[in-house]
């Protein structure tokens, strides 16, 4: 597994479809809601990248149990708990990536989406590229 695949595996581990931001609108199609979009980057040993991801959902006025900020915040909390205070390490080739919660910015926050019926929570993570896991 390479670092791209590891990030994809991590984000798909929360019961929602997850898409690299560069591929989410492949062939002009928008994915179904809810879903996760995430930034990805390849690094070398010793590098740290600050990346973001978003959980998206759509309010459907015809469905009573539709999207809510509460549900999105619970999902963000699940992701935060999975990363934990010590971070989450994943094996990548001869090394690995270490996903952490940044100390200098909030982990998750509601963000405007540009549409009244779309809800979005943006999350920031640090990814350290490490050798010899």
Tell me what each language-model feature is.
Residues 20-30:
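Short acidic low-complexity segments
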Residues 29-32, 47:
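A short, polar/charged loop/turn motif at coil->beta-strand junctions and beta-hairpin connectors
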Residues 1-19, 39-133:
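Charged, amphipathic alpha-helical segments and their flanking helix caps
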Residues 31-40:
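A short, hydrophobic beta-strand-centered structural micro-motif
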